[in-house]
């Protein structure tokens, strides 16, 4: 079968290609650039527990050496600390330059035998039929490519989106920030800060080796920021934080980032899909566009892998858009609803004690991956089976508990995601202290193993000593991307089969014809 064509070699395209490769699906990644990104420390990303685990699982080795976990999160108002949040009970956000994330994923993709990276080629035409997609590129490799599916991960100006004729409505210039990456010593080593004054807002986020990224909120349609004006911002801000005297600093990189909010009308057209910035733009109030793109990749990869290996139903393939577009739309809606109170300059109301606390909470959520602005999304399951209550609602992300894998090793549950397989998890207290040989063939295990082997799609049987809120002998059915599908009281083969069949959207049916099938070959067709 033909490989999946991935257009775009940023973090999302590379992550998708690696996720597909991890499920045994070959990909061709078409990169318009030369295959190397210039270092830009002022362009960075924040990853939370799920996306950091995903990048690690995909083989990105730059997370450890070029990323920094927040030691704490501080908020201050008019020079006085109002809150300090630490991360003893849950993983701290990971902050790293985007070029480092891209390079780590690119190195992993380059070393994987199922991923082919093609540089210096620009897509200028595509056409579809019932069996696949044909794409034409010009540049380094002027040729036609044949794929089983095609995914546009080619950014905000997506050629794929334009060739498919998909609209991209939204709001421009929602926020504008002056950004600087600099090396200096601040009074709170390794701790991120959100500082709000009467007329300004600044964030400081640590990077390794004493480097910080500083962001100043600017008027969305204000004047250009000159180099002298930016230096003044830097000196005044550092002096305010360091007792009135500007400490020595080394300015490494600067920029002005304008944030837009947009959402593509459709994310699927036949065998062609959109992901990442090609499908959505966000970033205001601390929301993370790259992180949402990685979630797109994880959601789509297992569904395409199932279709590639054994065929998938239209319901399953449609669920990518239904789940991810709904999740991103909710994020954009939450930001739009919060913006007037946080950015509208509503006078005294903004400074009342209750209002200030509410604003602080909402601004913190996006940065720390909490609430409507930042939490990992839940996806409504096709059939909500919850025979046993647990701390995780059906559709929610599962807890990262230690589990015994099929090979007998004990690993975090998240380490086993992303392989295109369902996971069936049995909660069996005591298994963590007994040798696997003593319990694998005893009790519920033989019946459960037989039920798992009979499922309509590939699945792995795991065992955990405990799971939050779950009594002994609870069986959890987990999607390949780590979202809970169902819970059962003990071994229920028929019900487990039905739930697994619902997760895959039922048996494969005939493919739906794309809405746009002719090739587009004229250069003007992809110009705004």
What are these regions (language model features)?
Residues 140-149:
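Core beta-strand elements of the Rossmann-like FAD/NAD(P) dinucleotide-binding domain
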Residues 39-110, 332:
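Active-site-adjacent segment of FAD-dependent monooxygenases/related oxidoreductases
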Residues 9-11, 32:
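Glycine-rich Rossmann-fold phosphate-binding loop(s) that bind the pyrophosphate
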Residues 119-133:
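A conserved short coil-to-beta-strand element within the FAD-binding core of flavoproteins
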Residues 2-3, 7, 21-23, 103, ...:
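Helical substrate-recognition/capping region of FAD-dependent monooxygenase/halogenase enzymes
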Residues 136, 149, 153-259:
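Conserved FAD-binding catalytic core of PHBH/FMO-like flavoproteins
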Residues 21-43:
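Glycine-rich FAD pyrophosphate-binding loop
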Residues 11-19, 152, 251, 257-337, ...:
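Conserved mid-domain beta->alpha element of the FAD-binding
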């Amino acid at each position: 079968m033909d490989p999946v064509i991935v257009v775009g070699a940023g973090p999302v395209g590379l992550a998708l290609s690696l996720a597909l490769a991890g499920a045994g699906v070959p990909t061709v990644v078409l990169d318009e650039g030369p295959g190397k990104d210039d270092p830009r420390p002022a362009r960075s990303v924040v990853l939370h527990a799920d996306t950091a685990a995903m990048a690690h699982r995909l083989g990105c080795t730059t997370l450890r050496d070029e990323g920094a976990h927040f030691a704490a999160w501080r908020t201050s108002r008019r020079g006085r600390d109002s809150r300090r949040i630490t991360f003893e009970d849950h993983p701290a956000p990971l902050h790293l330059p985007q070029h480092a994330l891209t390079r780590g994923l690119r190195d992993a993709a380059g070393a994987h035998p199922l991923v082919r990276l093609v540089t210096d080629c620009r897509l200028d035409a595509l056409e579809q039929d019932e069996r696949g997609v044909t794409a034409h590129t010009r540049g380094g490799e002027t040729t036609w490519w044949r794929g089983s599916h095609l995914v546009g991960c080619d950014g905000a100006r997506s050629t794929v989106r334009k060739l498919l004729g998909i609209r991209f409505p939204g709001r421009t210039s929602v926020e504008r920030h002056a950004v600087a990456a600099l090396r200096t010593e601040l009074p709170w080593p390794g701790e991120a800060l959100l500082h709000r004054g009467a007329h300004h807002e600044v964030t400081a986020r640590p990077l390794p080796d004493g480097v910080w990224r500083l962001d100043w909120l600017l008027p969305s349609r204000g004047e250009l920021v000159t180099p002298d004006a930016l230096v003044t911002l830097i000196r005044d801000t550092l002096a305010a934080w360091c007792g009135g005297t500007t400490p020595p600093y080394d300015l490494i990189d600067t920029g002005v980032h304008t944030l837009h909010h947009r959402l593509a009308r459709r994310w699927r057209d036949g065998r062609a899909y959109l992901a990442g910035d090609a499908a959505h733009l966000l970033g205001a109030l601390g929301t993370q566009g790259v992180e949402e793109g990685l979630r797109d990749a994880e959601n789509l990869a297992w569904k395409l892998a199932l279709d590639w290996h054994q065929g998938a139903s239209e319901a399953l393939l449609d669920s990518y858009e239904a789940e991810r577009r709904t999740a991103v739309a909710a994020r954009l809606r939450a930001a739009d609803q919060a913006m007037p109170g946080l950015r509208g300059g509503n006078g005294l109301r903004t400074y009342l004690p209750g209002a200030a606390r509410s604003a602080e909470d909402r601004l913190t959520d996006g940065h720390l991956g909490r609430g409507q602005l930042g939490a990992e999304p839940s996806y409504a399951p096709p059939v909500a089976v919850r025979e046993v209550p647990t701390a995780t609602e059906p559709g929610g992300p599962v807890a990262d508990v230690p589990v015994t894998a099929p090979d007998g090793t004990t690993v975090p549950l998240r380490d086993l995601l992303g392989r295109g397989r369902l996971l069936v998890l049995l909660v069996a207290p005591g298994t963590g202290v007994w040798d696997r040989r003593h319990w694998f063939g005893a009790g519920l295990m033989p019946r459960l193993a037989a039920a798992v082997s009979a499922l309509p799609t590939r699945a792995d049987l795991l065992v955990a000593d405990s799971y939050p809120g779950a009594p002994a002998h609870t069986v959890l059915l987990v999607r390949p991307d780590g979202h809970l599908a169902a819970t059962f009281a003990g071994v229920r083969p028929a019900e487990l089969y039905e739930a697994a069949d619902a997760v895959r959207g039922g048996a494969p049916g005939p493919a739906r014809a794309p809405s746009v099938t002719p090739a587009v070959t004229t250069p003007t067709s992809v110009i705004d």
